[in-house]
Amino acid sequence: MKILFLTPIFVFFFISCSNSDSGTEKSEVQSTDSSEVVADTLADSVVIPELSEDLVSLLQKKTKEYDLPFELDSVGFAKLSEAIDKRLNSKEIKLLSQNLLDHEYTEEVNWRVEHLLKMEERKRKGGYEEYLNSLDIGMLRDIEASMGPILRIDEHSFMILWKIEYGSYEACPYYSGTLIIASLVYQNELKNSILVGEVSGGADAPVWGDTEVYSTIDSKGIRSIRKDRSCEGEEDEEGNEIIEEKTTDSYIHFEETGFRVEKEGNSK
């Protein structure tokens, strides 16, 4: 009789526990579904701003538009630098250079932008001819910035390529160069800029040096290779110049906050 009395109680306890577990599972499923709905709602509510008036005006000067990937090797560099011919004014230069990425590659750009803006001011105020008449060896003869194509990342994100070209008075010491800079526009907002191409050099015989920067740009980021060569005028036993070479390999990732250096190292 005791066994018969306990059996109904055991069955009742088992059913109660089963119902409790089912309720917990349903609650968890409902909670998960609710979280997914909230996440989807937040994603749908992201508002992409319109392009600023300054950017709209600037983009009227673009030469072409390319999809990624884009190869900026020696051949691509030559074609690109020849195709970039629409001059940038001081306001546009300041807009594009306002957030240069803190990186080894942009040290040269920062310095050139300072000289570029000073030269633009001379030309605007009518003092450029007087400046040319006062040129001496080693002085900057001219420097200009020009608008290039855009590289399309997606509907609301792209890179603006622009060029700085400069040269000194034609005597030793002499220097000249072409810089290609990429400015990132992410979801219609201008973020920052970084150097992606360079061909430059200078000499004060027998000392000389040159630099080349080429890049491969795809939907994930930019891989840049910088090659520096220099000679201090020294020769080996056979009379050949002793040339020092250094190669730096960098990967620049782009995200909603702008360009970010992911890795950097010396290859040689």
Predicted regions mapped to residue ranges:
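Positively charged n-region of N-terminal signal peptides that target proteins for export
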Residues: 1-5
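Terminal domain-start segments
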Residues: 26-148
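Structural signature of eukaryotic scaffold interfaces centered on beta-propeller domains
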Residues: 146-154, 213-218
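Short beta-strand elements that form the blades of beta-propeller/WD-repeat-like
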Residues: 157-170, 220-227
